[in-house]
């Protein structure tokens, strides 16, 4: 397996993709063994996937991306609609923590505007969740509802729902906005870090992200939480000292 990993790295395959492939291979072998097929023993070897540092959008980058997703900047109707869809899906992901595939298959029937929530089935962990909507997200989806017909919030040109087009549109906007080192998944990370920096409980963030275990959330965001805690601690030095004892005459 270690030789295979090195081969894929030389081909330019990213570590995160290799990790997904290796997990899928391991899952197939386990299922085959469970069904009674003979699966020879194999060794994974010594190899490590290099985790990237947690990257999230800052307060300057988000407006630049939204500017590049402004549909009024293009005249062609087809591109205008496509850019509007990309803008709406960007707002959905950064305000609700959706994965790109979850956002792409969202149906109008799964949105309850009266209660301000989105009902979501997360196929990755096989559970049902509901995500409260921010005012910004609710307004975005209500406005989209006026012009989009059919079952899906982000329909494809020939029916069904959009898939890879959403990802390409977002990556193109990142490039035009000169925001580097990000993908569509970083909106989800931005959603989580903004909650944590405002004091949200890690278990609440876990459920909103749809992680099966809080350990997954802690592993992904532990460094961020620690760094923010250190910053808040150092900020105490900039505050005037408050006397703890009252002077009694």
Residue ranges and their predicted role:
Residues 1-30, 37, 72-82, 159-165, ...:
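N-terminal core-binding DNA-recognition domain of tyrosine site-specific recombinases/integrases
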Residues 110-117, 181, 200-220:
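Short, polar N-cap/turn motifs at the start of nucleic acid-interacting alpha helices
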Residues 16, 34, 88-91, 95-102, ...:
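C-terminal catalytic core of tyrosine-transesterase DNA break-rejoin enzymes
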Residues 19, 34-100, 104, 124-126, ...:
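Basic, Lys/Arg- and aromatic-enriched nucleic-acid-binding interface segment
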Residues 46-47, 78-79, 96, 101, ...:
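Basic, Lys/Arg-rich DNA-contacting stretches centered on the C-terminal catalytic core
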Residues 56, 122-126, 209-234:
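Catalytic-site neighborhood detector that most strongly recognizes the C-terminal catalytic loop/helix
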Residues 67, 71, 143, 156-158, ...:
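C-terminal secondary-structure termini that scaffold catalytic or DNA-interacting sites
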Residues 134-180:
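Active-site/catalytic core of tyrosine-dependent DNA strand-transfer enzymes
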